[in-house]
């Protein structure tokens, strides 16, 4: 999306001390795609896991420590609308500025992305393979970090997103 392009360009050009990636906890898997793109820039980053209250009301159980371990990042649960967790987020920003961490899981993912970039000639095929690999990675870590109720109710917005963001059905 245009927002993702602008975000990535800003981070590359301005070289911030730390990137605060605000992630919607209720739609964690969808948001991890951008998170992985930002991580590929190798900049210090913190995840502000916003709307954690909404995710909990939906019956989602997020293993924050496991998410931190998999991504090598501090993950701070917040409810921005009620100013909950914001002080902890500010403290994390101060302590994490300038620090990058890498995990074996992430390194393996980035190595596989590099392999695709080095071996696949067609730009379109390269992007498709990288996208597939990214979704596979998200799915693999999601099983360790996210538990959802079996009978989860989907909102109209969720159903629209499933079609619009589908790699085969989405409008290019």
Regions found by a protein language model. Give the residues of each.
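Pre-Walker A segment
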Residues: 148-162
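Acidic/polar residues at beta-strand termini and the immediately following turn/coil
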Residues: 24, 79-82, 166
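Conserved C-terminal guanine-recognition region of P-loop GTPase G domains, centered on the G4
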Residues: 2-76
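Core structural elements
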Residues: 39, 133, 163-165
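Hydrophobic alpha-helical transmembrane segments
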Residues: 159-172
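Alpha-helical transmembrane helix bundles of large polytopic membrane transport and channel proteins
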Residues: 46-47, 56-151
